Amino acid sequence: MHEHSVEKTQILQKYLELPQNGKVIAEYVWVDGTGNLRSKARTLNKVITSIEQLPEWNFDGSSTNQAPGYDSDIYLKPVAFYPDPFRRGDNITVLAECFNSDGTPNKFNHRHEANKLFQAHKDEEIWFGIEQEYTLFDMYDNVYAWPKGGYPAPQGPYYCGVGAGKVYARDVIEAHYRACLYAGINISGINAEVMPSQWEFQVGPCEGISMGDQLWMARYFLHRVAEEFGVKISFHPKPLKGDWNGAGCHTNVSTKDMRVPGGMKYIEQAIEKLSKRHNEHIKLYGADNEQRLTGRHETASMTSFSSGVANRGASIRIPRPVAKEGFGYFEDRRPASNIDPYLVTGIMCETVCGAIENANMSKEYERETNEQ
């Protein structure tokens, strides 16, 4: 790690301790037109206690691949806010949806459509837990701590590894964990993954739209923490060719009927419904996913649907304790690490709980790829 790439946090600290004279800083965060995050800050005159107190804002969408230059204003509508783990105090981080100048959702705003489904199926109490895998790179786009011009020893000792040479950058991971807890993200765990310098964190259980909200914010906090250490975060599903594991976003799902004794019947019904919409789901399950879903490295084939108990090579896995108890949840192992969680949770709700008249998650993919 090169010193010039690391933020001077110790110098910054004395300024962070200065009083703000009654002002609050709100960092607005949004999803841009490339599947990445952007943010900018503004000063507010009072402590924020409800989402309604936050003003709408705007930005230049032509600089984020979200609008043409001749009509570039994109509007930010706050939908959730969290304590800011970097500025602390009364300062907040705000998640915002993007809308065009005519009031329609921007084509990269998939939260709006997904939320219609969650509102319509509120009584189902659909819960999600997402396992976010990612890979660390240095400032020169080499996998973090890998030998220069070479490769580490083959996979084997790295998954949940302990000790030098088996795990790398634990300080980044621990800092991110604490930042999420401080901000109120329902982060439920972390672990080192199968490939060296690949890690995972889990968020959930979260109900409905809050799953996407919290995962996007957890990603934002990860990027911000990694900035300070001079580390890049990659969510590419297959960052390295060869005999190395890819990166996924395994998505665990349950409805209230699945979580009570006798729930296995509803789990099996959901899997049957999912089997009939495999291709529609795959379209929304992340770019470059075909590089990962090969049937090797603990993945299913991209071209066929399968399910099984404790089978990490299946599209849908039923955990063994769930099969034994007869109720609980199932795991969709198909989503890639770079998913938009609103697309994945939205189409999952649509398939499992039922379509509604004014929402169509499959069209979200077409809207993003075809709309000018």
From Swiss-Prot:
One of its GO terms (biological process) is glutamine biosynthetic process. Its EC number is 6.3.1.2. One of its GO terms (cellular component) is cytoplasm. It is found in: Cytoplasm. Keywords: ATP-binding, Cytoplasm, Ligase, Nucleotide-binding. It is an enzyme of class 6 (ligase). Residues 110-372 form the GS catalytic domain. Residues 24-103 form the GS beta-grasp domain. It catalyses: L-glutamate + NH4(+) + ATP = L-glutamine + ADP + phosphate + H(+). PROSITE patterns: GLNA_1 (PS00180), GLNA_ATP (PS00181), GS_BETA_GRASP (PS51986), GS_CATALYTIC (PS51987). InterPro entries: Gln_synt_N, Gln_synt_N_sf, Gln_synth/guanido_kin_cat_dom, Gln_synth_cat_dom, Gln_synth_gly_rich_site, Gln_synth_N_conserv_site, Glutamine_Synthetase. Transmembrane segments: none annotated. Its main location: cytoplasm. Gene3D superfamilies: Glutamine synthetase, N-terminal domain (3.10.20.70), Glutamine synthetase/guanido kinase, catalytic domain (3.30.590.10). It comes from the Eukaryota. One of its GO terms (molecular function) is glutamine synthetase activity. Pfam families: Gln-synt_C (PF00120), Gln-synt_N (PF03951). Homooctamer. Belongs to the glutamine synthetase family. This is Glutamine synthetase.
